[in-house]
Amino acid sequence: MYHNEKESGKAVSDFLSSSDNTDSLKREDIHFTSKLASNSSYDAARKSITRSVKECGLGYIDLFLLHSPHGGKKARLESWRAVEDAIDDGEIRIGGVSNYGVKHLQELLDSKPRILPAVNQIEIHPFNTRFDIADFCQEHDIVVEAYAPLVRALKMKHPVIASLSKKYSCTPGQLLVRWSLQHGYVPLPKSVNKARIVENGEVGGFSIDDSDIKKMDALDEYLVTDWDPTDTA
């Protein structure tokens, strides 16, 4: 949906066949995700998935998400049926949703799908905790992928974040990533800076105390840095 499947897939293929691939990684070692831009009909969704697989050139897509709950109940359920069939046909390995609120998830579960959603990708961080959605997901074994886990750098100098970063000898970004991990989420930190990408992943050397996790939880102010369709009809 971001019009970069071809380029992203080529980058993966080029790397796997290059001398930079010093660990001899194979296609199955790479986790490639794409999305359906909008829900409409079964046929439209099914064709879009096939097109995405062809565009990326990787043979299959590891995780395919319905980008939002927009489109209404019928479109949501028909689009999910297309995901199920694409999994059966081997075009994708795992299906999930994105920006789904509790009512959308419950709607999908109530429809008795053949395949349950494995992932719900939502904006989640200490300033927008969305515990209502996260708790529902975890109760139903749906992995929470946290996008914008760094709050798009809007809160790096917040007194609590700055103080705890100093306490744990880490960067604000590392602290925020660690918060997501300790809640059981899969954070998706974003950067175009190679050093910062590496830095954001170096979070295994410390753990945030429970009392400090609670301090960070209390920062919630429903800060939406992009959009929030989780309550759409």
What are the language-model segments listed below?
Residues 1-29, 82, 151, 232:
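N-terminal binding-site loop/beta-alpha segment at the start of enzyme catalytic domains
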Residues 8, 45, 49, 76-79, ...:
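Aromatic/hydrophobic pocket-lining residues that form the small-molecule binding cavity
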Residues 12-19, 53, 87, 112, ...:
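Conserved hydrophobic residues forming the short capping helix/wall of the S-adenosyl-L-methionine
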Residues 22-30, 59-63, 93-94, 116-119, ...:
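Short acidic capping loops at alpha-helix termini that bridge into adjacent secondary structure
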Residues 24-40, 62-69, 121-124:
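A short, structured active-site edge motif that brings together acidic residues
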Residues 41-56, 105, 128-129:
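Short, acidic/polar
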Residues 46-66, 85-89, 111:
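CE4/NodB-like, metal-dependent polysaccharide N-deacetylase domain
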Residues 68-233:
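Beta/alpha (TIM)-barrel catalytic core signal, keyed to glycine-rich beta->alpha loops juxtaposed to Asp/Glu
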